Amino acid sequence: MKRKLVTSALPYVNNFPHLGNLIQVLSADVFARFCRLKEYETLYICGTDEYGTATETKALEEKKSPEELCSFYHAIHAEIYNWFNIAFDYFGRTSTPQQTEITQGIFNDLDKNGYITEHTIEQLYCPSCKRFLADRYVLGTCPSCSYDGARGDQCEHCGKLLDPTDLKEPRCSSCGAAPEVRSTTHLYINLPKIVPEYEKWMPKTAEEGRWSNNALQMSKSWLRDGLQERAITRDLKWGIPVPKKGFEDKVFYVWFDAPIGYISITKCWADLAGKDWKAWWLDQNDVELFQFIGKDNIPFHTVIFPCSLIGSGKNWTKLFHMSGTEYLNYENGKFSKSKGVGVFGNDAKESGIPADMWRFYIFYNRPEKNDTQFTWKDFQERVNSELIGNLCNLVNRTATFIHRYYDGKIPQVDGAKSGREDIKSMVKSLREAASASFKKITELSDWAELRDSFHEAFALSSVANKAFQDGEPWKRRETDPEYAEALMSELCYLIKDILILIHPYMPQYADQAAGFFGQKIWSGNIFDGKAPQFNKPEGSFLSWKNLGEREGLKTVENPVIIFKTLDNKVIDAYRERYSGSQKDRKKSEKGCSACKDSGSSKSDAAASSAKPEVKLSPAELFSKKIALKTAKIISVERHPDADKLYIEKLDDGSGEERTILSGLVPFLKEDEILGKTVIIADNLKPRKMRGIESKGMLLAASWYDEEEKEHVELLQAPWAAPGTPVILEGDADISDPEAVKAFYAQKPAAIDADTFFAAPILIEDYIPKIEGKKLLVAGKEMKLEKVKTGEAG
């Protein structure tokens, strides 16, 4: 039996984790708990990522040393994860001697094997802080709009993309001193040289390990576009020293050493537990590494980290299964750790809403194949209808009925052995449904398809609820007691099974509900920050092997209400309380009074007198910054160096031919694209793809057929001339073409991808919209043929 090594993305220590960050840690927790219930040998490792520029800068802002800052936020993260009932085997840190030892060892192996190169580059240097500055830590006056607070990578006032040297009167963001241009030499990992060995490993592993589709496609895209040598050193003080002559004053770049943290944190665990860390990481053929990562970090774990391990020449345990999620967005916007926007772990902890209620919604809404939205309205509806109305209702009504009408004693009957066909048929139907669910949930869980697995458990709960309702035990206990007893006995065992199935997701609730029936379930200890937690407590516990068993239940305690429904008043108060940024909330003197109704908060809901920072809604962002227009595709050809890229030439109404590259080869043939009048992202920053510059992006939406095969449909406006602006309903007088052009002309010349995707275009009943407003082309709405709901991009 394969051993399971489980890791989640190491959270960075510059803020509180928000719900989007928590998805990875929680997902790995659910998978590890499932593995323990299956009695696989399991090790779940995580910890805080502590080195790098962001830590140094944050420490300066907070007037702390980097060590003090990391210790402060490490304790906060550990406390939040503890509150969320996350059962790490060990939660460590990357600023340890073990991390230094292993990182330097891997580097030395890479260097010895000829995979390290040197390159000299020019960077801005602050003579006052005595350090080189990353682009975003240079401020100055924008050469385009004269905004004085423009960053060295982009002016957020007008959207213009910049280099630090473009700024007028540039200054260091930390001390205000004028920077100098200096040369510096860095070490690089020669990824192109490692690619041949990587390409022997990746396809087979991705197939055997069933990598999530986004992980597979992103990895192939990186290879298709060509890997470049990547710098692995930085001119910083806070980091792991480089063990190479001439580079003693440099440290390793955080992206290089951070994934090695999985190994070093395992060593920290092993050192305390008296174990051998190499038994999990070196020369082991019976270990499967499951990694849980957000999509922005996928290539570092599917390409860069494996290349580093392969290049070392040693037989490291490498990625087996990659569970990469899409984004969880917040109320039609984006969670932002740096800006403090959204619901954060400390918010959840202080809200009064139980941890398992948060866990329920995160997994019911887990963004496995597409981005999903956290909205307070949906949170309310899912909690009230599924968690409380379905699962809790089943548990409470069954336990209450047994306690009230059978004196708390579960009928000791087996309906499958009844002499009556109607009773045997009822029991057979329930057991067949349960057996099918067990099989499906096990298969899904084995491959970390957690949302579908979770939904399946709730579907089984619905089956049990229907059996209760259809069986009418409140009538039959007097008119047909034999049937009522068989039904209630079967429901008690079915509830026992469902509680085992959901225990990885909601361990606290499942423990408490199982206690109503005199049972215990164990899937992991909560890490206390002091010692490794790998021992199962003494006593008898239910596990996966007990699914389907129909013996052992005797009595039922009088159940208590564990969760309260969330009413509109409560939800409106939460939405108000968690709008804006964390900084705005701290300025508020009063909190959320309606939260008291759910036992969620002791504060009042009055609005803050402090003026909040202006935050653009997706619709406002689109109207102010995002430029879409029509273009006619006049030629299509395959990219000579990329299997999945088309090179499209377009007439965009400007008088000059425009080139856009798209990854549509797997989805559309050339003749399905040629001649179409499509929608393009007009002011998206140009990007080189395999040596050819792509000026913009074609907009399309995807849909899946019954076999889960992905298809793509282009957004089109065949009635419009090339160059026709796309505007949002209500933005300009659509009857006046000049007014539309004038409105369109106010948008910035270039925006980055993050800005573009911060205004999601959702397909609602075949029509592209932003926040419910239609996108119009020459006064007409667009309508897709096959994509009824989804997102365009």
From Swiss-Prot:
Top EC category: ligase
Gene Ontology annotations of biological process type: methionyl-tRNA aminoacylation
Catalytic activity field: tRNA(Met) + L-methionine + ATP = L-methionyl-tRNA(Met) + AMP + diphosphate
Signal sequence coordinates: none
Cofactor binding note of this UniProt entry: Binds 1 zinc ion per subunit.
Cofactor(s) needed for function: Zn(2+)
Protein name: Methionine--tRNA ligase
